[in-house]
Every structure is written in structure tokens, then in C-alpha cells.
Swiss-Prot record:
It holds the Pfam family Ribosomal_L12. InterPro entries: Ribosomal_bL12, Ribosomal_bL12_C, Ribosomal_bL12_C/ClpS-like, Ribosomal_bL12_oligo, Ribosomal_bL12_oligo_N_sf. One of its GO terms (molecular function) is structural constituent of ribosome. This is Large ribosomal subunit protein bL12. GO terms for cellular component: cytosolic large ribosomal subunit. Belongs to the bacterial ribosomal protein bL12 family. The keyword Ribonucleoprotein applies. GO terms for biological process: translation. Homodimer. Part of the ribosomal stalk of the 50S ribosomal subunit. Forms a multimeric L10(L12)X complex, where L10 forms an elongated spine to which 2 to 4 L12 dimers bind in a sequential fashion. Binds GTP-bound translation factors. Forms part of the ribosomal stalk which helps the ribosome interact with GTP-bound translation factors. Is thus essential for accurate translation. It comes from the Bacteria. Keywords: Ribonucleoprotein, Ribosomal protein.
Length: 128
């Protein structure tokens, strides 16, 4: 640190609590700022309001494989392998254990594209 900041720091350390409070008040008035710590403004919001806000700001989506008809399993399996990069065994287990998330925390456009691929292969999918 520079000599100036070292001096200021030493002087601040020597202040009494009353002097520190006066200094804070003067800084607030001089610079037009508030030294009050945020008191959980977002945390204090009502649960219903937080849920509504979350829906508006949602940027990450999960693609859920809801259902796979038996006669479409192989086609869906190929699509799932392509999307996830999983091996045959893991992809097969995923397809057979539907409903199951296929892709999590992806953008809206990607999620819709993946959903369309799955539906084109014969599966029922949803974006959440």
C-alpha cells in the first residue's frame, strides 16, 4: 500500500466507536452514499413474489424425456446418445427409466431444439 493509505488506516484504527460513527455519517453526507448493509432485501421477499420473479428471469431450462413408446425406443436411444454423449448402456438405461432429465441447465433455444429432436424420434418430452 502507499504511505497515504497506510496513514489513513492507522488513523482509522485509533478512532473510538463514537468517532467512527461520526465519520461514517460525514462520508454518507459528503459522497451521497449509504453505509447500511443490505438487510437481505431479496431474502425478505414473499415466497409468492420470489416464485413469480424466478419465472420471469429463467434463463436455464431442463429437457425431460417423459415417455418412450416401445416401438420408438431405438430411434430415441440414438438421439439421446447424440445429445448426451453417453455410451450405449448408459443411454439405454436413461431411455428406459423415463421420465428422466436428458439435458439440464441449457438455454431456451437449445432446450427447444433438443425437445424437437426427441419428439421427431417418437418420444414425449418437455422443457421445464
Amino acid at each position: 500500500m502507499s504511505a497515504t493509505t497506510d496513514e489513513i488506516l492507522e488513523k482509522l484504527q485509533s478512532l473510538t466507536l463514537l468517532e467512527a460513527a461520526e465519520l461514517v455519517k460525514q462520508i454518507e453526507e459528503t459522497f451521497g452514499v449509504s453505509a447500511a448493509a443490505p438487510v437481505g432485501g431479496m431474502v425478505m421477499a414473499a415466497p409468492g413474489a420470489a416464485a413469480a420473479e424466478e419465472v420471469e428471469e429463467k434463463t436455464e431450462f431442463d429437457v425431460i424425456l417423459d415417455e418412450v413408446p416401445a416401438d420408438k425406443k431405438i430411434a430415441v436411444l440414438k438421439v439421446v446418445r447424440g445429445i448426451t454423449g453417453l455410451g450405449l448402456k448408459e443411454a439405454k438405461e436413461m431411455v428406459e427409466s423415463a421420465p428422466k432429465p436428458i439435458k439440464e441447465a441449457t438455454g431456451k433455444e437449445d432446450a427447444e431444439a433438443i425437445k424437437k429432436q426427441l419428439e421427431d424420434a417418437g418420444a414425449k418430452a418437455s422443457v421445464k
